[in-house]
Amino acid sequence: MKQIAFYGKGGIGKSTTVCNIAAALADQGKKVMVVGCDPKHDCTSNLRGGQEIPTVLDILREKGLDKLGLETIIEKEMIEINDIIYEGYNGIYCVEAGGPKPGYGCAGRGVIVVIDLLKKMNLYKDLKLDIVLYDVLGDVVCGGFAMPLRMGLAEQIYVVTSSDYMAIYAANNICRGISEFVKRGGSKLGGLIYNVRGSMDAYDIINEFADKLGANIVGKVPNSHLIPEAEIEGKTVIEYDPNDEISQVYRELAKKIYENNEGTIPKPLENIEIMTIGKKIKERLKKERMKN
């Protein structure tokens, strides 16, 4: 069983990417689980017709189990598989970690609890999974959100980014976390996924960033009107229009990720290097503004 984690700046299209990769793998006959590691608990909604599912932490609170240890909960069979795992598109297993009540506790606790619970309930083996995809909150590489890479649970980490300055800045911070944790047995970087967000996106900017990081760009997802169209319907592009070119892009990306067994230790850029890339982006924006 493979375990892969996806990180990236909030709003970069990470959940869209994860859901489409999951859908592509499920269509290939793989048994797939997607674990949403974001307190907003909407990571898997496009696999379930736009419907959100109860989170693991919400279920524990509703059953009055949030103060008990996981060993006690499992030993006394106080929680069942159907309480926390829901089926989505083409049999994909969907799990949402959730977070604490607003203003209370650590938002990363849900990630720690859900991964621990899934392992102790032996669900990965019982469900005979081929691959687990962790969709992890934005650019926070601390506490529970770092668990998939910190503990080496994921075989590789993939970072979703555009050529936007803040997306690159966040991607660099994530790679800094990867390079630090890998010294203690953490996960390596599988590569960057270039998610084109608009007409000003530039491949050469991402290529320069990847070269300096020592990272591969494993795929480029073009900007497409079909993506938001599909999401309004609560679907992936794979489900919404399986014959479109963008669906094939996701299939090829899914195949690359599933077959990749290699990882690298990134060399995060210093702030001065990130600022240099930022200035190049700024010059492009100014030139574009002058045209108009």
UniProtKB/Swiss-Prot annotation:
The keyword ATP-binding applies. One of its GO terms (biological process) is nitrogen fixation. GO terms for molecular function: 4 iron, 4 sulfur cluster binding; ATP binding; metal ion binding; nitrogenase activity. Coiled coil: none annotated. ATP binds at residues 8-15. Keywords: 4Fe-4S, ADP-ribosylation, ATP-binding, Iron, Iron-sulfur, Metal-binding, Nitrogen fixation, Nucleotide-binding, Oxidoreductase. The keyword 4Fe-4S applies. InterPro entries: NifH/chlL_CS (IPR030655), NifH/frxC (IPR000392), Nitrogenase_Fe_NifH (IPR005977), P-loop_NTPase (IPR027417). Gene3D superfamilies: P-loop containing nucleotide triphosphate hydrolases. Its cofactor is [4Fe-4S] cluster. Its EC number is 1.18.6.1. The reversible ADP-ribosylation of Arg-109 inactivates the nitrogenase reductase and regulates nitrogenase activity. [4Fe-4S] cluster binds at residues 106, 142. It comes from the Archaea. Binds 1 [4Fe-4S] cluster per dimer. HAMAP family: NifH. Belongs to the NifH/BchL/ChlL family. The key enzymatic reactions in nitrogen fixation are catalyzed by the nitrogenase complex, which has 2 components: the iron protein and the molybdenum-iron protein. This is Nitrogenase iron protein 2. It comes from Methanothermococcus thermolithotrophicus (Methanococcus thermolithotrophicus). The lineage of its organism: Archaea, Methanobacteriati, Methanobacteriota, Methanomada group, Methanococci.
